[in-house]
């Protein structure tokens, strides 16, 4: 029974982290600070999530690329 509860909590926590990361990734390129700051923030989000380098595209989306 404890295993089931711990497993459920772990899956729920991982789900929250994934949703939070997706929201950060979507908001990374929308800023009033300018494109240089947005690209730096996007690159940091991609790097911290283990997805390599990142940059903002023309649609203001943060795109991570494994290199």
UniProtKB/Swiss-Prot annotation:
Keyword entries, A-Z: Antibiotic, Antimicrobial, Defensin, Disulfide bond, Secreted, Signal
- Presence of the UniProt keyword Oxidoreductase in the record: no
Localization (cell): Secreted
Induction (UniProt): Not induced in 4th instar larvae following a blood meal, an infected blood meal, sterile injection or bacterial injection (E.coli K12 RM148 and M.luteus).
Q: Which domain of life is it from?
A: Eukaryota
- Cysteine-cysteine disulfides: 29-56, 42-62, 46-64
What processes does the entry annotate via GO biological process terms? Answer: defense response to bacterium
Single GO cellular component annotation?
A: extracellular space
Span of the signal peptide: 1-22
* Function description: Antibacterial peptide mostly active against Gram-positive bacteria with atypical up-regulation of expression.
Q: Which family does it belong to?
A: Belongs to the invertebrate defensin family.
Q: Can you say what this protein is called? A: Antimicrobial peptide defensin 3
Look up and give the organism this protein is from: Anopheles gambiae (African malaria mosquito)
The UniProt gene name for this protein comes to Def3
